[in-house]
Amino acid sequence: MKGHVIISHGLQSSPEATKATAIAKVAQSLGWTTEIPDYRDLDASSELGDVLSRIERLRRALAGKRTPLVLAGSSMGAFISARVSLAVAVQGLFLMAPPTQLKGYDIVLEAAPVRTCIVHGWHDELIPAGEVVRWAQKRSDHLVLVNDSHRLADHVEFCAQEFGRFVQGLA
């Protein structure tokens, strides 16, 4: 099965982010089309950026896309990908370092009941690993915990490889 992947970067990041581009490269090598929306203009508005506008931009990016669709994201990008999956039919979610809640917002991490893979750092200084373990356990999601911090900087290639295994398993 091949389709389209939309990869959402995190706060203080860009479409050229190392994890986003590594995942895009793997997806393309497997025959998937990809896009990485740019949220930098929205992220400059406050400490957490404009979350609701990010969600709306991702929804618009999905309009008219061919299926199957997979959403991937890192940190805030993971959060909005999960939230958008509640409104748009997707085949799967690949979430890296997803926050389970956002300070100052009355929304928590929720996602459609679709195949989901999560990669999270044991030493994440922003989002405690235990919160993500509890969230993933409630959903019986595939969760990989790695010896890394929030940015998963030491596991970029691992994340890309894990993504490749994930999309190859979508059948």
Which residues are covered by each model-predicted region?
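Serine-hydrolase catalytic machinery in alpha/beta-hydrolase-like enzymes
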Residues: 2-68, 80-83
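Conserved alpha/beta-hydrolase "acid-adjacent" motif
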Residues: 16, 125-131
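Post-His helix in hydrolase/transferase enzymes
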Residues: 21, 153-168
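Catalytic histidine neighborhood in serine/cysteine hydrolases
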Residues: 33-35, 137-152
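Conserved alpha/beta-hydrolase fold motif
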Residues: 70-71, 93
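Active-site loop->helix "elbow" adjoining a glycine-rich segment at hydrolase catalytic centers
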Residues: 74-78
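A conserved short beta-strand
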Residues: 89-101
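Short beta-strand/loop motif that positions the catalytic acidic residue
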Residues: 112, 118-120, 124
